[in-house]
Amino acid sequence: MKICIYGGSFNPPHLGHTAALRAVRAAIEPDVTLVIPDRIPPHKELTPGSPEPSESLLMTMLAFSSEPGVEVSDMELHRSGKSYTVDTVRELRDCNPDAELYLVVGTDMLTTFEQWHDYRALLAQVTLVALARTSDEHAEVERFSAYLRQTYGARVIALPAEPIPVTSTDVRRLLPQRRGSEYLAPDVYAHIIQQRLYGARPDLNWLREQAYPMLKPRRISHV
């Protein structure tokens, strides 16, 4: 059995995340796909004002709800302290001793992999699936993948650039400017606006779309 593990802060989850996971699943054809939001990322500080873990979990579930065969897991949200991937992998390995585990990583995570907690043990347990956001990054992914293979005997699959080159940082920057809705699933964007997350201000076109069903036909031309 193949298990694909896609972890991250998903702060917020955007269409680049879902597009990337589709590319991974098409390449490795996993039997089970787990999307796992982390509680406290070990490699970076959470942005001030980030949603509570329960809010992040809900947004992630909304983002991936239309992806068949994808399960969103809260296994890291119940742990105290930082969310170390090696702990998650060990937990999954204990429950699935014969499974092939595939861990999805982006360019930044791949090139700093030697800084991960207990990274050698992690490399022994998983096949890395490395994704670049741009064609320029893909060359770097290929180079570092080769380095990990030669140095540690790592199993690494390097995939082409993600179809939607956007980051959560980009989305957080755009939302207070009434922009960025095009990078989010409609349900995720609606939740962000309704809960006033990230200092978001509603996109005016989105507001019009929300208002139309509540207006009488003769009023729509004036909106």
Residue ranges of predicted features:
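Nucleotidyltransferase catalytic core that binds NTPs
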Residues: M1-V223
